[in-house]
UniProtKB/Swiss-Prot annotation:
The gene is proC. The keyword Protein biosynthesis does not apply. Transmembrane segments: none annotated. GO terms for biological process: actin nucleation; chemotaxis to cAMP; negative regulation of actin filament polymerization; positive regulation of actin filament polymerization. One of its GO terms (molecular function) is phosphatidylinositol-4,5-bisphosphate binding. The keyword Transport does not apply. GO terms for cellular component: actin cytoskeleton; cell cortex. Occurs in many kinds of cells as a complex with monomeric actin in a 1:1 ratio. This is Profilin-3. CDD domains: PROF (cd00148).
Amino acid sequence: MTWQAYIDTNLIGSGFISAQILSSADGSSWANSNGFSVSATEAQHILSCFKDSNKASAMGITINNVKNFVLKADDKSIYAKKDAGGVVLVKTNQTILVAVYNSNLQPGAAANACEALGDYLREQGF
């Protein structure tokens, strides 16, 4: 399966409105949904937040120029919220999944879908 297929099938197909797969090494983009792109500055901030989860909690996570309030952050996942939507970020050995949802997808379902793909990618060595 291509990286784009993971986006289209596993994330957008689960109800996310936007998604992107980044390299966990340097933050470069491997695949993204139509019209969605995390900026280089945002990607570097995401990388630093996975190294220091306190930074995520203190500064929040900005995705596509939208600042999200961080609810949970550790070295494997970051959950953040903005109004009725939010973002789920999941880090694997080689990737960072970035998945944005709105009020049509419940936060718990969003976290489960993104975490399930993250678990699968870890099992596959990614």
